[in-house]
């Protein structure tokens, strides 16, 4: 009847009081003392449970993954002190009462947006001749965890991607990561380019497990990101419409160096990883030229299916990774396939369409995916299917004639900081669009101060999803952002003509 049975908070009450919830006991006993004074008392601290929640019928336990901290910056969030339970943790509770049973925190004192919300798979794994009930987990931080699901003991934590630099591994005696001290940018006061970045070595795109092969198939990716302490007042100030994560966004924007831009494209890649939890090694993998590929599905017929952000739908042999199918789907694929039977005939279905955080913020790192059209479509396949995709609409013409640069170097620099703080998460790094939201470099209002302001602060396009920043940005700030976007339009056209705006269809 919709009556609330129990509630479990993943972060403490900012006033230090009980919540009248199932989590009160464990916070009073252990979790609350892992938090120190900081901005979490204003922001809430984070800890959202937004993806994997699974039930173990045999043990009568409910497991859920907990998200990152808010703000990201642990130095601001909690004064740089404490593990901040239950951020970035797997938590087990009694499903009837919500009573805490156990937890394992994958990233203590989380500060890089390393959520632990990714998919939790229940399995049995033979270890030293004994079958153990375990959880498989491949979160953002790049390590594959095997956890005893009876009591939360860490069994193993091994990398499923290359290049991880925030930690070198895990100490199995303590269950804690062996961190690179440079990764805690708020302690060193120096920028840190982290691998993986905030978008993770594995994000929300589903992974799958095949009991026959014993392998887990992970849609992995390599997306480095720069982290720095917020230096400017713009980055420090919490804003109603701002991305309030407590890092300096300017570090993430590339310098005026075309080689750096092309290096960013080359460094941002995807990979299908077949991971063996028993050995802690990658059994096989297949490289992709871009990140943000679709989830995986594996079947009893020794198959693995996956769509890619470059618009291909692929099938591989599950044991060896031999490519068996590669079909052009006209649009990017971020969803996972599903399969079902009707009258004894098997079907495979999936959705096409670009979407999610990466195409919004990626900028140049979107690489080859930028020019793919965004076509939302349900595709259903079967053996012997005869249907064909309709022809693509004809490409439109992009008119890329940047306005005259009227802004001074000081105005452009100010606009860059403001763009990073207010605009980058929807309109892309360096104002390079990815075909998902408008590419501001070719905006029809870019050359007109008043028209630009009518959109940014006047709400002229609020019906299309562009909110007004009228209560947040001054007239001077809006104009400085325009000067910066004009600068990006002119510079990229001259130095990176291949980074033209996505072609309309």
PLM regions with names:
Residues 1-39, 76-115, 123-131, 143-193, ...:
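Extracytoplasmic/lumenal domain signature
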Residues 54, 188-193, 199-225, 258:
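Long, low-complexity segments enriched in small/aliphatic residues
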Residues 65, 138, 219-221, 307, ...:
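Residue-level marker for isolated small/hydroxyl-bearing positions within beta-strands
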Residues 389-411, 424-443:
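His/Cys-centered metal/cofactor-coordination and adjacent catalytic loops
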Residues 394-410, 417-421, 464-505:
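Flexible coil segments in periplasmic/lumen-exposed cytochrome c-class electron-transfer proteins
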Residues 416, 428-469:
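Gly/Gly-Pro-rich "capping" loops immediately C-terminal to redox-active cysteine motifs
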